């Protein structure tokens, strides 16, 4: 297993022999700047991992190849669901072709989470402000990647995903680990009153008369409600909006923002 890379954070370093996982950032801060490409937004010259944000798919594919090589996962099929900000979870092990030789990229439709009990796949979800969560149960040998923006958090996708996995015996809440990645933190996630009315009040605050939502705290509470131990929940703590040198942010940079990823694979 490769050592931690400058362009991703490993949330489960103590389990390197069983799992490889990471929350990526916008690129290696020590790397020389990419040569300017006229007409290409600057974000796309960084480590953009989103195939559906307007970047050249070939360039995105090369970026993914860099991440997978740095993490020792090259050669494995990549599973990235086509997300809808909902609460559905795809099972990579049940995807067509999953038992034989799947293509390099599998994109299950209409899911914002994906799980697997196999070492064949790299599971990933992408984001540019939304929270992502990685799930790993070292005893059961199950991994999952979850995309939970405010809509997914409202739909309780992390809670539902954990309950589905526990209900099918694929994780045990007392042994499962949950890692929360970089996202808009409460001080940066300003919302209007119409959105605030849809969210649990205990995770809302007022800053300068405006509503703010604590997305990580809400998802942490969902994990605890499923029986995940508090000491098994780890939060990277980074804010995408406030750290432009390390993270893309749709709210800060607009539609041409790149995308980061949360990825995980059994070894």
What positions do the PLM features span?
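Active-site microenvironment for binding and transforming phosphate-containing groups
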Residues: 1-267
């Amino acid at each position: 297993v490769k050592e931690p890379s400058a362009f991703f954070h490993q949330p489960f370093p103590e389990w390197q022999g069983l799992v490889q996982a990471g929350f990526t950032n916008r690129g290696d801060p020590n790397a020389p700047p990419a040569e300017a490409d006229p007409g290409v937004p600057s974000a796309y010259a960084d480590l953009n991992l989103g195939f559906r944000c307007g970047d050249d798919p070939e360039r995105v594919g090369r970026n993914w190849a860099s991440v997978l090589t740095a993490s020792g996962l090259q050669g494995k099929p990549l599973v990235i669901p086509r997300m809808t900000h909902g609460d559905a979870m795809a099972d990579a092990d049940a995807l067509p072709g999953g038992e034989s030789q799947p293509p390099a990229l599998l994109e299950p439709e209409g899911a914002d989470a994906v799980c697997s009990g196999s070492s064949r796949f790299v599971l990933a979800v992408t984001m540019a402000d939304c929270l992502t969560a990685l799930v790993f149960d070292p005893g059961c040998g199950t991994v999952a990647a979850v995309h939970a923006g405010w809509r997914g958090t409202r739909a309780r996708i992390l809670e539902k995903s954990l309950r589905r996995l526990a209900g099918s015996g694929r994780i045990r809440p007392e042994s499962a680990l949950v890692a929360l990645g970089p996202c808009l933190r409460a001080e940066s996630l300003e919302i209007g009153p119409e959105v605030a009315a849809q969210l649990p009040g205990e995770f809302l605050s007022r800053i300068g008369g405006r509503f703010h939502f604590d997305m990580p705290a809400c998802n942490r509470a969902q994990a605890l409600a499923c029986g995940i131990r508090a000491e098994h929940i780890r939060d990277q703590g980074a804010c995408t909006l406030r750290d432009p040198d390390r993270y893309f942010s749709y709210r800060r940079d607009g539609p041409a923002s790149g995308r980061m990823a949360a990825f995980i694979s059994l070894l």
